[in-house]
Amino acid sequence: MLFRSLKYIYTEHGYNKDPELTNYWFNINKKYNYNNEHAHPFSIFSAVLYVKVPKDSGNIVFRRPDVAYHYTRPDVNNSRNYLSYWLEAEPNLFVVFPSYLFHSVSQNLTDEKDDERISIAFNFA
């Protein structure tokens, strides 16, 4: 199911190849941990699967990759003209995005005793 969905994404973005999983890793963010803004070079698409997400343990934040926003500021901000866009992490949420898209993970500020946010990140060529 996952690779069928990824194949659809590849095709829709003009790639005539099967997705190839190149690497993956686990992220364990304890209270006050966060991930600085970064991208994933040498990949076409990246993804994250949230496994364990305590309340207020941080969201993934994507930054608009172009500078148009700085020159043509809209009167109303919405999901089509954002400078940054965040998704609230929740268990079993699987997010696929272009690897060039800069993103970060906000600070884990949970008050839950079991405070670790756990996710699995993937890169596909």
Give the residues covered by each predicted segment.
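A short coil-to-beta-strand element that immediately follows conserved catalytic motifs
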Residues: 14-24
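Short beta-strand-to-coil "C-cap" segments at the C-terminal boundary of structured domains/repeats
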Residues: 123-125
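Catalytic core of non-heme Fe(II) oxygenases with the double-stranded beta-helix
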Residues: 23-96, 106, 116, 121
